[in-house]
Design a protein with these regions (language model features):
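Conserved catalytic or regulatory cores that recognize and/or transform ribose-phosphate-containing ligands
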Residues: 1-146
């Protein structure tokens, strides 16, 4: 049973690389949003044309980025990091939940209260990327961590 996992959320740490490396050899395909801030912010106007109003500039980018998110969201891991308010991550978690997708949240304990409703929608809340890898391994072949 292959897994297609969308790795959404903060872009300031190497959590994605840790999960991909830990899952090497597993039947998992990973995808993610575009993590280049400039490309993600400007993709809409670069492709569809300039906008005078920043609201519409951002809106075009959000729509184009949403295509990638919707196509990639089979099973989702959403990471909430220590820095910045990650509204996009919260939206991606809600989208995955709304689409009935399996959702794993990766967050530090200090976010527990703020994310209690998001966590309630998740099938698992992990603290470390290695725990996500362990969940994926268990789902694929029933193997528990040693």
């Amino acid at each position: 049973m292959p897994l297609n996992v969308f790795l959404s959320g903060e872009i300031h740490t190497d959590w994605r690389d840790q999960i991909v490396a830990g899952a090497k050899g597993m039947d998992v395909t990973f995808s993610a949003p575009v993590t280049n801030h400039a490309a993600s912010d400007d993709c809409g106007v670069a492709i569809l044309g300039a906008e005078d109003d920043k609201f519409w500039h951002d809106r075009k980018g959000a729509f184009v980025n949403a295509i990638r998110t919707r196509k990639g969201s089979e099973d989702a891991v959403v990471r909430f990091g220590d820095k910045y308010k990650q509204w996009n991550a919260a939206f991606d978690a809600g989208l995955a939940y709304g689409l009935g997708k399996s959702l794993i949240i990766l967050q530090p304990p200090e976010h527990d209260h703020a994310l209690k409703d998001v966590d309630a929608a998740a099938l698992a809340v992990a603290r470390e990327p290695g725990q996500v890898v362990d969940i994926l391994r268990y789902v694929l072949d029933g193997t528990l961590p040693s």
